[in-house]
């Protein structure tokens, strides 16, 4: 029989919303003046290597700063959240509010065509991705989907061979892939109206998520919740 586990409701909602937000941010990056990804580093790292290979110092500097900004965001997330195990009460709210501030700060710079705005947005994405938590061995990331598609392929292959499949992992993969794709579509529509100011929308949403998470934690604490991940 497939392995059956539960993920708390707040984690389902939060994970879906954050993947949706990341989709908007990444779409805005691709449609912006540099046409680059913001929420993941695979392409950026390849382009850094290309810049080294072609001797383009300016591009190497740009991609190095983009990668470094993402890394700094992840470092900040590690310092704020501190633990990788998914659990209500972790300081996700503070991390999200900081991400919101970084995205707000990026908007006027992007509107002016400054790459510094991209670095701030990348730092925010690293901060969000650094919040990735582990639940019963499952990594829950929300800013890129390569791993999700890989996991889906593995699970489908295992199922075709008649092996046990972890249905919770499949549902998480489908959730993140679907909401990230929807966010990208919405991001494209928003960019057609707002241009580089599109990041105002994810900035507001991440701020609301941070505040909402903090209020939810207080609500659960007020009702004597233990804060265990199985609550919710």
Regions found by a protein language model. Give the residues of each.
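Short, Lys/Arg-rich, polar N-terminal cytosolic tail immediately upstream
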Residues: 1-11, 223-224
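Helix-to-loop junctions at the C-terminal end of transmembrane segments
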Residues: 75-88, 191
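Small-residue-rich hydrophobic segments that form or flank transmembrane alpha-helices
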Residues: 8-60, 126-168
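Symmetry-related core transmembrane helices of the 12-TM Major Facilitator Superfamily/SLC fold
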Residues: 94-101, 197-214
């Amino acid at each position: 029989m497939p392995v059956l586990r539960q993920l708390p409701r707040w984690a389902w909602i939060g994970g879906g919303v954050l993947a949706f937000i990341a989709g908007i941010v990444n779409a805005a990056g691709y449609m912006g003046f540099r046409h680059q990804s913001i929420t993941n580093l695979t392409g950026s790292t390849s382009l850094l290597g290309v810049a080294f290979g072609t001797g383009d110092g300016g591009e190497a500097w740009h991609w190095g700063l983009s990668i470094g900004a993402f890394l700094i965001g992840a470092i900040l997330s590690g310092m704020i959240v501190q633990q990788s195990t998914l659990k209500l009460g972790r300081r996700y709210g503070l991390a999200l509010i900081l991400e919101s501030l970084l995205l707000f700060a990026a908007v006027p710079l992007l509107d002016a065509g400054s790459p510094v705005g991209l670095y701030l947005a990348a730092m925010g994405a690293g901060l969000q991705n650094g919040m990735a938590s582990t639940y019963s061995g499952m990594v829950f990331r929300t800013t890129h989907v390569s791993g999700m598609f890989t996991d889906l392929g593995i699970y489908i292959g295992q199922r075709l061979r008649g092996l046990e499949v972890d249905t919770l992992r499949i549902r998480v993969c489908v959730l993140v892939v679907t909401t990230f794709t929807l966010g990208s579509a919405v991001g494209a529509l928003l960019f057609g109206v707002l241009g580089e100011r599109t990041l105002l929308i994810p900035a507001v949403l991440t701020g609301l998520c941070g505040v909402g998470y903090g209020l939810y934690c207080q609500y659960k604490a007020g009702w004597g919740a233990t804060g265990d991940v199985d609550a919710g």
